[in-house]
Amino acid sequence: MPEDGGPFGSEAAEASGAMSETENEYDDHEPHHKDEDDRMSEQNTTPDGVDAGGEVKKKYDPKDPLRPRRKKARRACYACQRAHLTCGDERPCQRCIKRGLQDSCQDGVRKKAKYLHDAPPEALRPVLGPNYNPNAPSSRHGGQRHHSVSTDASTVRTFFSHSNASQYPVYSSTQSIPHGLTESLPFNSQQSPVSPTFQQTSSNPPISGMVAPPVSSPMTPFGLPFDPSDPNIFNFNIDGLNFGSHYGAMEFGMLGHMSSSAADTPPQESGMGQQPGDVHFGAGLFGSHFDNRMLPEFLGLDAGANGIYSQGNLQHGLPHAYAIPAGPTSLQSPSTENNSPQPTTFGFDDRPSPTMSQYPNAPGAKSSSNSRPSKLRKLDKVAILQKRQRDPSYIYDTVKKSFDYVGSFHKLFEVLSSRFSQPHAARIAKSLAAIRPALLASTRNLTTQDLIFMEQCFQRTLFEYEDFMTQSSSPTLACRRTGEIAGVNKEFTALTGWTKDVLLGKEPNRNTNLGGTGVRTTPRLKSLNESSAENGGAASGPRPVFLAELMDHESAVEFYEDYSQLAFGDSRGRMTRKCRLLKYRTDKPAAGGGGGAGEEERKPDPSAAPRQQEKDSRHSILSNRVAKIDGEHGISKLERDGKLECSYTWTIKRDMFDMPMLFVINVRFFFFFDDYYGRRHC
């Protein structure tokens, strides 16, 4: 009997296997239960499981979890997709080669997602790999795309390479430059999306380095249709984005390209672009009229002082709010000073000079630049950026001694005894005496280094609160635990008329509005500390204003009574009360009768009100016209006899030793109106 592995047995088995696969290849109705591993093992082995070399091949169980798995392809071919078999990334795949279908092996068609219905079919092909061939022709057959097989030369081609891409020449400073080149170079040459790397071999500074002539770019002109599948027009690596589809990778890369080049071209240069397809490179566009150190500052300035970003057209006196800075590179901080905001563009002259900016090599450029003073050299860059650079590290370098809280409490009692009557001063002293034992117990074991560290923490906390007060729209105060003013915002100065320098003790306090105090019958002798303070006040340093000097008598007493309860009580607690703030006035009080005792308030002179408003507007942060309108219908309407009816909410910030360190006060004022019956409402 002939063996099963005879000459006719193996051929019959291969023929039968091939016929069975041919019959089941494009059958959509018959289910396929055989795995691809089983089919390939049947093709390569005899019925006995012996291959042509005589070695026995191990047949893996399809359900065995330890069997080797094939790498999943990103997209199956059309034949493997219909047969529901495992395919590979190569084209043609191994299965189509073994079946003789390598000529018709092509990518299968996937169902479009909803967000890709408007996408062209060319953009839905898989992510480009090393087999990408931009010159490969594509044709349509039966609604499907057919790609030619890429050659071996295309597999070793780099990702950004073109067969017809021109090389960029590099010129050194020693080579000759074509005549008439610099005259045709525009000042604001825009860079092409294709950004090759230029290496400068010259040792000269960059301002007078190499100048490259305009070269032809391989990018397609914008007037002609371009191929979105060509990655060279966007100059980014699509394979490195790890996207599953070519369309998503191109969209993400294009958004990144647009965002990276958004700040390259200023809006002033939108009408002076170059021709498409020409790339102008050159570091010597500015000529030799400027210093090398002036180039970074010169490039960061706005083009003209009268452009759309300038603020010089604002009218004086108008009620302007916090103005937007002059441009993206402006160094001016928002403010509402009396002077009108000026454009922050600074350069070589007060007016824009088109000759200097657009024609740097003109004959008259050198003489004009020499005749004008170089203002840019005199500007200190550190001083300009000082308003924007807030670094709290200087606190730990400058604070070398602790704050004298004992002397500050002595000054507070001097103010209380000189401005307040005896009953009110006694009530405030009683409130402070309630927290005195707790303060002494907390500071008993503290060393000098602890006190210095306590002051550093106070300055660091105040540093943060100053930013909060600047951004807050409500009048805000920051005080020490003794009541000295440590920080204030502009809203509070506009409300009360107290300037920041007076509140912080940088200027003498000349306020004469004492809240309607009367003259004592028995004068009090000045102490030794008061006499020394008056004689050597300037030498003793700044003397900030106490919070008790900003309130009338009843409001100050109520504040210190709340302070005695909140100082060592709830650390998150807050207090809200009504008060009367005193307006800052420097008029000399009229010589009234000296026999009045108690709290009789002085009546202001009606004729002196316009003069006082005019004086207050000079020191106000508002302009003259705004201050005049404000005096008639604004904040000045709220004050009665030099007092403002307000409501304040304050809380205490403690330090690391659980002692009251800083309390912050937010003020809110009321609008009063009279009803039909003459009753006053808030």
From Swiss-Prot:
UniProt feature, compositional bias: Basic and acidic residues: 29-41, 54-67
Localization per record: Nucleus
Family classification: Belongs to the ERT1/acuK family.
A cellular-component GO term for this protein: nucleus
Keywords: Activator, DNA-binding, Gluconeogenesis, Metal-binding, Nucleus, Transcription, Transcription regulation, Zinc
Compositionally biased residues, Low complexity: 9-21
Entry-linked PANTHER family: TRANSCRIPTION ACTIVATOR OF GLUCONEOGENESIS ERT1 (PTHR47659:SF1), ZN(II)2CYS6 TRANSCRIPTION FACTOR (EUROFUNG)-RELATED (PTHR47659)
MF term (GO), any: RNA polymerase II transcription regulatory region sequence-specific DNA binding
Biological processes, Gene Ontology terms: cellular response to starvation; gluconeogenesis
Top-level taxon: Eukaryota
Regions recorded as binding DNA: 77-105
Function in brief: Transcription factor which regulates nonfermentable carbon utilization. Activator of gluconeogenetic genes.
Primary localisation category: nucleus
Protein name from the UniProt record: Transcription activator of gluconeogenesis PODANS_4_8760
A Pfam family that the UniProt record links to this protein: PAS_13
Organism listed in the record: Podospora anserina (strain S / ATCC MYA-4624 / DSM 980 / FGSC 10383) (Pleurage anserina)
Composition skew (Polar residues), residue ranges: 185-206, 329-345, 354-373
Gene3D superfamilies: Zn(2)-C6 fungal-type DNA-binding domain (4.10.240.10)
Region of interest called Disordered, as start-end residue ranges on this chain: 1-72, 122-148, 181-211, 325-375, 509-541, 586-622
